Amino acid sequence: MFEGDDAQGIDSVFVLGNGPSRKNIDISKLDGTVIGCNACYRDFTPDVICATDAGIMSDIIESGYDGQCYFTHNSWNLLPEEAYDPLANGTEHTTYRRFDSEYFVYISGLAANCIETKSYIIWVPKGMENKIKNIGEEVLEWSTGTSALHIACRDFTCNDYEKVYLLGFDHHNNYYDNIYTDTEHYFSKDSKRVDGWKAEYNNWDKQIFKVIEEHPALQFVWINYRGDDFPKLPNLFSKDETEIWQA
């Protein structure tokens, strides 16, 4: 199924997962709002970044990224600098505090090896206080990628025949399939899930389909979909990466 002619020449939003199928796509050529996930900042600067793990969020802040952020579903709560001494116990990973930082967030997540848990104190750079929002409890426990798709439709479209592209959403293998596999704050390729990674991916697919069904006036284009079981939804289409820039 391919995208309809009536969708030509309209605004586009690109939601980038971190599956290997997007590794050969030149992100700088994407004409529209680019929403990235987690460690994408290591390779390019998206317009918006979405993250749900504390370790990745601390890395994003320490990288100097100063764009719009959606961090956690409901746990990003600013605390005044006066609360630091009563809370800190010296075991946390604490980000660099600039001289003008007035607020921080105290949050727990996984350590860099994605095995142990770790608490983080994230100092918020001056000017970023209003650029970082919670994703929202309506998609609590969703994956980062599917949460980013939800954000794209809720906050970055007019719900009027705009195109929403999905890139790097690779949900077909039964192993951890990610560009950043075996790096800090990411699982190893041989990591396991109780019911297998495919079961996890199937759940993520259901989240994607829910978003698509909730926005019938938007056209969704899944780039580099792999498999012969393409979902039959009236507003979901497929394209190869070579066709992204074709009318």
Predicted regions and their residues:
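Metal-ion/cofactor- or nucleotide/acyl-coenzyme-handling active-site neighborhoods
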Residues: 1-247
